[in-house]
Structure formats: C-alpha cells, structure tokens
Amino acid sequence: MSNKVLITNSQKAVKVPSGLRILIRRACNAVLEYEHFEAPAEISVNFVDNAAIAELNNQYRNKPMPTDVLSFPLGVDGKYDVDENNGCKMLGDIVISMERAQEQANLYGHPLQREVAFLTVHSMLHLLGYDHENGGLEAMRMREKEEAVLLQLGLPRTVSYTE
C-alpha cells in the first residue's frame, strides 16, 4: 500500500507551478523512506496565503504574523492513529504560505519549487517528531536530514538555480 498525500490549494496569491504537486509527493515519500517509516502514511498539505497562515500562527503559536510553514502532527511519541478506510497512519497536516515561499525563493535565488520542497521536507520531519525550537543538537540533526533528503531529490542547497 502506498502513502497518501492530499494536497489542497486554498489561495490565489501565487500560481502553483506545474509539477509542484508531484514534487511534494516525492518529498513526503523521500522523508518517510529516509526515516525508515514502514507503514503507509497519510499527510495533508494545504497551500494558503499570508493572511491565512498569520491567523493560524496566532491561533496555535500566539505569534500574530505570517510564517512560511506550519506543521500539525497527529502522532504522539511515534504512535499514530490509523485511518480505517485506507489503513494509513495519519501523520498530520502541513500548511504552506505560498506568498512567503515565493518571497523566500526570490530572496535565496532559487525556484519556488525548491523552496516548497524544502518547506515540505522540514514540515514532514516535524510530523515525525523532530523539533528545532530549542536549537542545539536536535536542530542540527534536523537540518542535516533536510539537506540529505533534498540532495536525494536532486535539490541541493549549493546548486545555482535558474528558472
């Protein structure tokens, strides 16, 4: 049985590039493979605008400003509920601000696709229990995993991108 990646576009501010949904599915699957996550998983990814993510950021993190991505893990200590309809472990929800992703892609000089792939990989690691809020070794391990998965996807940080 394969993983289920449900992708919704709830914004109109940024055009979703062709192939982005496939890249997101590849990124989710690459993280699960890298982390040796054996069971089929279900992940929800929602594209929103800055206003929507600012509202969620305020509601759940008490930070009334836009951010690039929010993760809403459903698992606790590596244990996940199983969707009885499809047998998948429900990992959680990823919410990506496409406006912020475009701003960051422009800032870092790479395509929107690479930025959204990075945000997806980053958020997937959160869904699997990783955290970087306190810095230190956990944050370094998370960054190393992000870069390893992006390299596996052919999207390393060191490449000079052109669209």
Regions found by a protein language model. Give the residues of each.
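An acidic/histidine-cluster motif and surrounding catalytic segment
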Residues: 1-117, 125-163
